[in-house]
């Protein structure tokens, strides 16, 4: 199994050096949930791996209550920075991630990495200490900065006008970094992260600028904001812990505990990420440096239960750790004593009755003291090593099985970091399939972490945000709200669908004012969307604010960008007035005003007819005929006028009180059909037909028509020829405009 695991590891290693972590790999909500926890919470809400070290992944339990507690605290410690973004694959100079890659080895050597919990609540350590004077001067320093140069103003204006111009941001950030301008850097980076918080490389650049100017406290705050935004970023955790080790205050003797707490926050935040190997390796290396071998074993016990890219290498290193050290050093005292008793019982002669009655512990030294007999001591050590490896082998075997189920999905992730460029379809499909697999087979914790990883790479695709929010609905209302807020305010400010879903969610929760503000915000961001305006109208209508609903529609009519848009809203307003407010007169007035401004729009006439039909048709006969005449005398297209002409004949046939009016309508309809036929012949033959031939054809058509009308048999007034009544059922609505083409069948064209 190990060999197979190593071969798979090699495959991924060929794609990404070291642990396979992508240069810009970031973390999102899963860790955001963690970021809201306080240090005291960590002991009760550690990932299942850390709680049940000896159990395989499938047995790990992540209770719904724990998930709820985590997600409910997501936003408690939110810092001014918005959710994190990832580095983009812009030109080399624009890719902060690439520059940071070259610095990663130093970070790994100097400090273990950790993706931790939310920076604001991380009671990891007192922020790295600098002399009090520089820290105190940090705030007053800003106003003392020289005025911003003209070039800065020019570059800043570009991104202010178009925040989605990522290259513009890159040029601005490069400029302030090259000019070493502290005030400009602060303004530029703070503005940049409001739009692209997932670019972890730029968080490090920002922190480095603060550090170079001597503002260690500010640099620490920048790191914490970055980890608040992207807690799944292994790389950012590595840089941060390196920063802590270089700048920590060792005078109080708590430096070691602070670093250890940082690592714990880190592995809690992103330790279950498939590509978190370097974080675990750094943690292990640091504990080894401290000489805490029992802690190293405890870390391995957690790691060997987690499906990661380098799972096989971890097990091999664990065996080396066991073989290279004395069990009493790398095991906790409790496990050491328990294992010693277990081995003593196993080696006790089975036929010795006296031995059975004698407690085995009485033959053994107390605690972790060595056996007096050197030979027995060596044997005991070897047996203990064998037993320790044997128990972890079972964990490894199960973990390898879990890795094998996910390997194809992980290998299919070619861009695990954020970028403004669109993802390939194969990448999107891989994420969809991976999420579906984890939803069906994984624990809630693993599902959350995978969603968070997905949202880094797919931050600009609303389908994944929506899917994540739907998943969290069964766990926590606050978690759902957090996801929608992050999607709509940071990553997808101009995607209406996710905003509409967020507003609907808030309305379901009874937060009507919040729903209103969401819809207003998206309408400001993307003006002119009918779906948003109609959702605002329906929101007000559902809650009895009819005046506001009417005002919204009236405003849309008045401020329509063209007559067609105004007509659309006029129809909506008329329907509301009729169906909801029971005001037929006002509805008719709205439609008539719309007809005056847009007389070629057939939908207005159809809705006006529907309005007239809704009453007593016998009493409204004159108004209905007037409506038909208004449509027929308009400058609508001929095909539309034929449709209204046919409907006028239908109406008079069904409800008319005057045969003369009916016959006049029929004759008018025949003239329109003849006009249409003439246009068809011209389209087919052009204007090259001799006038004599064209006249003969027209005469024959007229004669044939007259003969049909004059025949004394049923065909002279036959519904099958003149009015195909069955084709017009009561199920048809006046508003079904797409059926215009069907009305030509009512009147077959004159024979030619």
Swiss-Prot record:
Looking up SUPFAM superfamilies in the UniProt record yields: TPR-like
Q: Which parts of the sequence are annotated with region: Disordered?
A: 1-148, 347-374, 678-703
> An example of a Gene Ontology BP annotation on this entry?
mRNA 5'-splice site recognition
Residue spans with biased composition (Polar residues)? 28-42
| Annotated Low complexity bias | 43-56, 76-94, 133-148
List the keywords (alphabetical): mRNA processing, mRNA splicing, Nucleus, Repeat
Q: Name one GO cellular component term.
A: U2-type prespliceosome
The record's section on InterPro entries has: HAT, TPR-like_helical_dom_sf
* Repeat positions for HAT: 180-212, 214-246, 254-289, 408-440, 442-474, 700-731
Question: Any keyword RNA-binding?
Answer: no
| Gene3D superfamilies linked | Tetratricopeptide repeat domain
What ranges does the record list as Basic and acidic residues composition bias? 678-699
Q: Subcellular localization, per the record?
A: Nucleus
Where does the record place Acidic residues bias? Answer: 352-361
What family does the database annotate?
Answer: Belongs to the PRP39 family.
Q: What is this protein for, i.e. what is its function? A: Involved in pre-mRNA splicing.
Name of this chain's protein:
Pre-mRNA-processing factor 39
Chain's gene name: prpf39
